[in-house]
Amino acid sequence: MTRPVIALLLVLAIACSASANLDGCLVMMTSPTEVLPGGTYTFSFWVQNESQDGEGIATIQISFPDGYTIFEGTMACDEIVVGRPSFDMYIPPIDHTAIWEDNNGGTGEILPTEGTTVYIDATVADVSYGTPIFWCVQGDGAGDEVHEVCGCIQVAINPVEDLSWTAIKALYR
C-alpha cells in the first residue's frame, strides 16, 4: 500500500535589492518537516529582520494553498523582549492567509537584527501537492523603498510504500 508523504522543502525566495530597506529579511518554515494529507499540524516559521537602514517588520503574512484549513485560535508568536512583538493575529474571511500585524502603529515589531517564531495550526489539503506556501513581510515604512519582501516555501509529495525495502531505499535516493 502506498502512503503519500509530503516533504516540505524549505525553498527560500528572497526578492529584494541590495539597497532595499528589508534586504536580507526572510521567512523559513522550521516545522513540521513532513506531513500527511488530512493531518493537522502546528506550522512554525522563523522570521528574521536583516534591514540595513533601520526598518522594522510590521506585518507578516503566511498564505497556505487552497484546501488547507487554518485555525485562527492557534496563532501565536514568541516574544523578543517582554511585550514585543505585540501583533494582532487574524485570518481574513474567504482566504487561507494568516496575518500577524503591528497593533500599535509605531515602529515595526521585529527590529533589525531581530527574529521571532510565529505559529499556526493547519490541516493539510488532500490535493495540494506541489503548491507552495507563500509569505510576505511588510516594513513599517521607515527609510527608502522597498517596504515588502515576499517568497515561498515549496510543498512536494514523496510517495513511498509502508514497511518495505522500497520505502527504505527511497530515503537514500
Residue locations for each model-derived region?
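Bacterial N-terminal signal peptides
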Residues: 7-17
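Boundary/junction segments of secreted and surface-exposed precursor proteins
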Residues: 16-42, 136, 157-173
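Intrinsic-disorder/low-complexity, polar/charged segments enriched in Ser/Thr/Lys/Arg/Asp/Glu/Gln
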Residues: 38-44, 59, 97, 115-119, ...
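A surface/secretory-pathway sequence property marking extracellular, secreted
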Residues: 59, 66-106, 147-153
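Low-complexity, intrinsically disordered segments enriched in Ser/Thr together with acidic residues
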Residues: 99-131
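Serine/threonine-enriched low-complexity regions used as flexible
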Residues: 122-153
